[in-house]
Amino acid sequence: MKLSIDFKNKVREAILSDRENYGGSDADYAKRLNLKGAILSRLKKGEVEKLISDTQWLVIAHQLGVQVRDNAWKVARTVVYTEIEDNLLYCKEYSKSMILVDDCGIGKTFCSRHIVRKLKNAFYVDCSQAKTKQQFIRLLAKTIGVDNTGKYVDVKASIKMCLIYLEQPLIVLDEAGDLDYNAFLELKELWNATQGECAWYMMGADGLRAKIESGIAHKKVGYAEIFDRFFDITSIVPQGTDDRREFYIQLLGDVASVNAKQKEDVDKLVRKCMNPNDLNTKDVTPSDWKRLRYLENLIKLS
């Protein structure tokens, strides 16, 4: 697959935009993208040809949310988007820490990625891609622009220094339930070292909820301290069945209204998500409800 000049220029524009939201040096920013400083300098001057491999272009595009093909999926300001945005802005402003534990498929990842890209010194980490403490620390280092190839203790020390040096940094830890026990303990150390200087926002679904409950119930060393530091555990989806149903109808409707090809299809799409098997209404249970990924597939196939 040969990448077009237009695509490379889109990635270049994304790099320049992302650079504006990073408070470190050009050299540090280049490390985030696994680029040499000289290559970044040439990109800033407008060059795109014969600088890096097509694979590197694609890796950077993925990191910065640039699509190879425009899928035309629009962002809806749902209650999930607004709640996460409010949480992130609060944490960032006051260097606080929070945990969001909620249903899967409500747009937590999509919303947080979109919001983080707009904020200065805000960083998104997908913990499902770095489950052990070694993988996690080195991925975090790369994400914030720190050399992640040295000795483990040196990399960790550099992370602490960088997070203290940056202005109001925010770290979003998505899929945090995938982190193993030792990686969780590293979070306690990082939080202690950056208290009052860095905001942390942990997100997850059933896996994170189970890890929190099991760790505290079995009195695993460090767990109570970790979740005490992430002082507020929040959820967005209501608990009562009727309230949950109304929440999902609203969420699906909000997303469908800005993405459906025909506006008159919105109600039909929502009904299909809430009752995908065409059951009698009284036989439909919350476990039958489909969520945003299903809605996206319906819209793209329509």
Mark where each language-model region is.
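C-terminal alpha-helical "lid" subdomain
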Residues: 1-66, 232-302
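Short C-terminal boundary/hinge segments that cap the last helix of small helical domains
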Residues: 65-79
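Pre-Walker A adenine-sensing motif
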Residues: 75-93
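Sensor-1/coupling segment of RecA-like P-loop NTPase cores
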Residues: 97-104, 191-221
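Short, well-ordered alpha-helices that flank and scaffold nucleotide-derived cofactor binding pockets
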Residues: 117, 142, 189
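Conserved catalytic segments around the Walker B and adjacent sensor/switch elements
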Residues: 119-129
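Mid-core helix/loop region of P-loop NTP-binding domains shared across ATPases and GTPases
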Residues: 132-138, 147-199, 221-222, 226-227, ...
